[in-house]
Amino acid sequence: MATERIEVFAASPRFVNKAIKARAQGKAKRRRLALLIALLGTVVLWPMLAWAGAHLLIVKSDLASADAIVVMSGSSTYLERADWAAKLYREGRAPVVILTDDKLISGWDRKEERNPYFYELAARELQKRGVPESKIQVVSDIALGTYEESLGIRGYATAHQLKRLLVVTSAYHTRRTLWSLRHACEGSGIEIGIDSPPPGWQTPAPWRWWLRRWGWKVVAGEYVKLIYYWMRY
């Protein structure tokens, strides 16, 4: 009987090295492809997510008529808030406009030789836009912070028997403001409505806020404050 001969060929080191190298190159290509897909997905999806995140902060609770329009203090955004409040006043939504004095001051005014308070600047803008000085009221000694400001507004409204308040603030501030006021006014019988100017004037537009540091402070920072408020109050 013939003996079957089996020959085993050992792979040369050169062949093994080439195989290992090819496998490593394949893995590297797959990683680069995955990274490219992730990058393209981010480029496409992130603007949509950023836009949606900005819009989630914007709420509106309308009141056809109110006892007063209340303008939340806003420092550098006082102009858009005063402008919108004046618009609502001209529409006949309320007989008076209330400003809150949070004691923050603006830049130096050479003509007056002092730093005007932001509520004073807001009052001037209201008058320029058709709100008589006699129809502008000021809530003094308001503490810093939206919730503390809401408590001050409740106290003023209660003292003056105001039961329906139409509140004006900047768009991305509306959700936290509405939550704060309703929480602060709970059990008081005060009805709260909220309105805001469209973003894009003194606040960044929803589709491009993330392109500037200021936008991250205004939009992303608002989520941080919301979480803090929900945990604290």
What residue ranges belong to the model's regions?
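Intrinsically disordered and other compositionally biased segments
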Residues: 7-10, 25, 64
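Coil-to-alpha-helix initiation sites in intrinsically disordered, low-complexity, charged segments
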Residues: 14, 204-208, 214, 218
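A structural signal for short, hydrophobic/glycine-enriched beta-strand patches
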Residues: 54-210
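Residue-level recognition of hydrophobic positions within alpha-helical transmembrane segments
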Residues: 28, 145, 218-221
